[in-house]
């Protein structure tokens, strides 16, 4: 290797180290063993091109991170939705840990900028490839778990993932009306009634407001582009209120 290329490699290395420092500052996560952090972002193509150096790719960390992510998301959903059936919990978890969701999170955190790639993978757009980014997110979770345990993983997810669940980002896979019905029937509280209380907007862009009541008492209000969507959002609000009341008792 010429002195010039050795200097270039060294410069690249220090630049990458600086990037990882900035990244840790930005997400308020500081690794005790930074080798694990670097490994989480090391693609197999990079290792193949640097065989003389002791680099490890992120595939084993990805395997571990997948399991850790499923566990932490499962724990959160189990506690948050006491009335939700096993089938619905499974569907919701699948929507949260599916590739498009993980890719969206990886983009939000600029994971693609940090990935160590081989030249061939780089030239074919690997840095933006969805499967690669989803794998890196899982590998990062695996690395964080190995470095610090389950609690810091949950703290990280509390900032970047759980609020999205709370804000209804995955509500398209949830049937809140059925959940509310089951919750009310289980406690023998009576029957629910849905009513469209308001409609507005032109015919091609209508917005509906729905109210769900129990024994004439309004429980939740929701809006949507269709009557069904508005009713689902009303049921979601009602369910959240009932569950909050239940946990206080």
From Swiss-Prot:
Disruption phenotype: Essential. Depletion leads to the accumulation of 30S precursor rRNA, and alteration of levels of about 11% of total transcripts. Increased half-life of type I toxin-antitoxin system RNAs of BsrG/SR4 and toxin BsrE mRNA (note these strains must have an essential second-site suppressor to survive). Its main location: cytoplasm. Residues 218-249 are annotated as: Disordered. Keywords: Cytoplasm, Endonuclease, Hydrolase, Magnesium, Metal-binding, mRNA processing, Nuclease, RNA-binding, rRNA processing, tRNA processing. Residues 20-149 form the RNase III domain. The keyword Hydrolase applies. GO terms for biological process: mRNA processing; regulation of gene expression; RNA processing; rRNA processing; tRNA processing. Mg(2+) binds at residues 62, 135, 138. SMART domains: DSRM, RIBOc. Residues 175-244 form the DRBM domain. GO terms for cellular component: cytosol. It is found in: Cytoplasm. It catalyses: Endonucleolytic cleavage to 5'-phosphomonoester. The keyword Cytoplasm applies. Its EC number is 3.1.26.3. InterPro entries: dsRBD_dom, RNase_III, RNase_III_dom, RNase_III_sf. It is an enzyme of class 3 (hydrolase). GO terms for molecular function: double-stranded RNA binding; metal ion binding; ribonuclease III activity. The active site is at 66, 138. Digests double-stranded RNA. Involved in the processing of ribosomal RNA transcript to yield the immediate precursors to the large and small rRNAs (23S and 16S). Also processes pre-scRNA (the precursor of the signal recognition particle RNA). Probably also processes some mRNAs, and tRNAs when they are encoded in the rRNA operon. Probably processes pre-crRNA and tracrRNA of type II CRISPR loci if present in the organism. Involved in degradation of type I toxin-antitoxin system duplex RNAs. Belongs to the ribonuclease III family. Homodimer. This is Ribonuclease 3. It comes from Bacillus subtilis (strain 168). The lineage of its organism: Bacteria, Bacillati, Bacillota, Bacilli, Bacillales.
């Amino acid at each position: 290797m010429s002195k010039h290329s050795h200097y270039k490699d060294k410069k690249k290395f220090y630049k990458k180290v600086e990037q990882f420092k900035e990244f840790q500052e930005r997400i308020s996560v500081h690794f005790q063993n930074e080798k694990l952090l670097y490994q989480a972002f090391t693609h197999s193509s990079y290792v193949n091109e640097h065989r003389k150096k002791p680099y490890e790719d992120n595939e084993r960390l990805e395997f571990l991170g997948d399991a850790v992510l499923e566990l932490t998301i499962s724990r959160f959903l189990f506690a948050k939705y006491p009335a939700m059936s096993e089938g619905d919990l499974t569907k919701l978890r699948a929507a949260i840990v599916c590739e498009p969701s993980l890719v969206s999170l990886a983009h939000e955190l600029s994971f693609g900028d940090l990935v160590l790639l081989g030249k061939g993978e780089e030239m074919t757009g690997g840095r933006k490839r969805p499967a690669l980014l989803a794998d890196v997110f899982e590998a990062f979770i695996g690395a964080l778990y190995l470095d610090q345990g389950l609690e810091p993983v949950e703290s990280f997810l509390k900032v970047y993932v759980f609020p999205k669940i709370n804000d209804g980002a995955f509500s398209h896979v949830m049937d809140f009306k059925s959940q509310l019905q089951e919750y009310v029937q289980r406690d023998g509280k009576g029957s629910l009634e849905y009513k469209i209380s308001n409609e507005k907007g032109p015919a091609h862009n209508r917005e509906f407001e729905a109210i769900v009541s129990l024994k004439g008492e309004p429980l939740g209000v929701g809006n949507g582009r269709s009557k069904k969507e508005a009713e689902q959002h009303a049921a979601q609000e009602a369910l959240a209120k009932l569950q909050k009341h239940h946990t206080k008792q």
